[in-house]
Amino acid sequence: MNKTDLLQRIVQALEHDMDLLQRAAQTAYEAATAPENIAENKYDTLGLEASYLATGQARRAAEIRQALLAYQQLALRDYDPARGIQVSNLVVLEDLQGQQRLLFLGPEGAGLKIGEGPAQVTVITPRAPLGQALLGKRVDDEVSLVLAGVTQVHVVIFAQ
């Protein structure tokens, strides 16, 4: 998958998530403000719970909006061996067992998965431990992470 197509698919996925979340937030807001959900006693908390849900969904929608804006403004850069891996690079890592992972180092949207099977791309950001470890690395460099007391070693086998 080329990076231009990948960027377009990331934007589409974020737009889809944004649409779903806006509808869910609107539904929760309507539930929170509905006359039938006004508390009749101190144990009647349906309206309060709905307002907490609406607030959380609105906060998540703002995060997705920020990610969407970041990707809409993202200038894709080719991998430059002199600079190493940077934001907007597509990277293939291989672990010691030969398992490969396809990663896109993006500005936002960590955890987003695009595609399926061996061609699935996972979005990571520089704020994540793996993203931090990748910044500045080059093809054939080793990347080591300690997660939950276990050292994970990967080799950068491709960067674009």
Predicted regions and their residues:
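N-terminal intrinsically disordered, low-complexity, charge/repeat-rich segments that act as generic
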Residues: 1-82
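Non-DNA-binding regulatory cores of transcription-related proteins
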Residues: 81-146
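Short, charged beta-turn/beta-strand-edge "cap" motif at the junction between a beta-strand
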Residues: 97-98, 144-160
